[in-house]
Amino acid sequence: LEGYLVEVQSDVAAGMPYWEVVGLPDLRVKEAKERVRAAIKNSGLLFPSRRIILNLAPADLRKEGTYFDLPIAISLLVNFGYVKKVAKDLAFIGELSLDGKVNSVNGILAICIEAKKLGIKKIIVPKENAKEGAIVSGIDVIGVENLSQTINFLNDNVVIEPETVDLQQMFYDDFISDVDFADIKGQSSVKRALEIAAAGGHNCLMIGPPGSGKTMLAKGFASILPELSFDEALEVTKIHSIIGKLPKDKPLMVKRPFRFPHHTISVPALIGGGKIPKPGEISLANHGVLFLDELPEFNKATLETLRGPLEDREVSISRLNSVITYPCNFMLIAAMNPCPCGNYGSEETCTCTRGGIEKYMSKISGPLLDKIEVNKVKYQEIKKDTKREKSEVIRERVNKARKTQLERYRDSSIYSNSEMTPSLIEKYCKLDERSENLLKGAFEKLKLSARAYNKILKVARTIADLRDSKNIEYEDLAEAIQYRSLDRKYWKN
């Protein structure tokens, strides 16, 4: 999501009419010649017949897209004498229509952030993108509607005030969800597991028969997700803006994304890629949730590609001359039946063979399972109409726990317990002797991996945070261990 500054250099000389663009432009950049020529003419200006050479520096980096139309036009207009010399700390971005209108482009937020880092003080962008760019403080964002207005602004014939936005108003947004946890009957232990997952950013797998409410619980999970911090909101918005999925009426995304891809999804669509690399579903779920329903129905090779991103929280896409890295710090919430027929462990009769169940479960590999906290939906719980808490009440507890974590990790580059490194685990997950013995016994009995050992401590830390406790108690650890015990039941017995 990082960029670089491109300087548009133009040389206009007498001679046979000729126009060449150099500096590794792609086809869309080369096509800018015709758009720019028409836009200048249709803005009431003469386009002289000259020999024109345009260089996009640095020349060793490929230039793609229609972002360069407006800066190319301004560079030529300065050479033609229609516009006075442009300041070094002023940048331009925008696509031109043939009639001179400045059209919106994708990725303005990321562009403005990078422009500020590179010392740009003012940037001229399409009017439709101005609100998005104005989210970045410390840089003046000027929105223009057409080329004529841009020329008049540069020549001091008109005044255009920098765009402003009210960030507090953007975050003041009533939370609306299609499913409230209070609408879901029973399932208290599953709701508890999902509350822990939301509070600590942990991954969760729900196993249960068809009709037990797994999908509804996952959709309800969106209603208890913690608020986005401003830095998280910026990162989420950048990714959606780059691929044109940012709502026009919402220049800043203030709610955590919830992505729900179909089980037929391809690897590039899930992970990211393509001829022109784009973020995949895991990056669109950054700082939010990726929900995979009917997990074993996904292609096994597709699921295995999640292992690296789940561990690294970023994904790299290699191309011939470059490597593009996208963030993918998401919570994985998955759901599946306990067997092919779906009735294993329920009150209904299971018609599957032992071999059939083992083959079905083997679609989820051990290394992938190690990255997921596991829970089981018990059929009997559906009939228990226990006290139902509203999502709003649960969300308050989740927000409080997340704020505790943000304060704890304020000097680190992480946001939640699930992101703790081994050194942070050692620092913040200290156990007393009784708890140490419990964990040692569970580790040996369940034959857990070293990664699972750390996962238990991370979950225990979150459970303690929900109690607003500085220390992990024996009961916190015992509850965390139970979320690891079910994976061995289903994958070993």
Language model regions located:
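P-loop NTPase nucleotide-binding/switch module
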Residues: 158-196, 200, 227-282
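Short loop/turn elements that form and flank the Walker-type P-loop nucleotide-binding site
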Residues: 47-50, 86-87, 117-119, 137, ...
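Walker A/P-loop
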Residues: 205-247, 312
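Peripheral, non-AAA+ core regions of ATP-driven protein-machinery
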Residues: 1-205, 209-215, 253, 318, ...
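Residues immediately C-terminal
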Residues: 98, 290-291, 297-298
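Walker B catalytic acidic pair
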Residues: 287, 293-295, 305
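Basic, amphipathic alpha-helical bundle interface domains used for macromolecular binding and assembly
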Residues: 22-33, 48, 55-65, 276-277, ...
